[in-house]
Amino acid sequence: MSFIYLFFYTIADGGQRIMSNWYTADTHFGSDSKEVLARDNRPFKDINEYTKEQVRIWNEQASSDDTIYVIGDFCNCFPKLENDFRSGLAVSKQINAHIILIIGNNEQRAIDVYFDGSFEKFREYCLNDPSCKFDDVKLNDYVDIKGEKFFLTHKPTDHAKDCQTLFGHTHRYGGLWKPFGFNVGVDLNHFRLFSDDDIMFMLGQKKKYWDEDMAINS
């Protein structure tokens, strides 16, 4: 099966990357995440190779002063496979940048099964357990990118009527964009992080071309 990947680069004057915020979703780190690799045809021989390459890419793109927003499903979680989600969350220790995790359905599954349904207990684990390195864990969030407000939430629903949404959840199957926002899933950007400039480029294309094309073809 062939794939179409978007491969965005953010290069400042002199070739130096200066972006401070990055976005991704649906990484599904974890010791038993091989089914995700197979289902999405991710081009890695096993979960160890996949994880190693993702860590390399993230640390190459984002500096220790930058912030990566992971918009859900950082980890994989299946009932009765507790080590799966814990090993997935532990990948955060290998990342140099700050990480803000937005809860996805896999994190919610871990909350329901292993943390008595308590978001706060899960958040405390992510922030304080020695195996993890997260700066914050949130149900959703807002960010301002060059004067434009964006709502960050895992599932692709038109939650915020006053701004665009950055989401994940559908992997590559839902496409790159919806009328209400953009899919920043890892499968949509050749396994690289989306930058602020990438988001603004897509917003410009959406306003200039994509919305009009949708109106013509609807």
Which residues make up each language-model segment?
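Conserved beta-sheet core of the metallophosphoesterase superfamily
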Residues: 117-217
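Core catalytic region of metal-dependent phosphoesterases/phosphodiesterases
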Residues: 24, 29-139
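Sequence-level motif detector for i,i+2 pairs with an aromatic at +2
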Residues: 18-20, 24, 147, 179
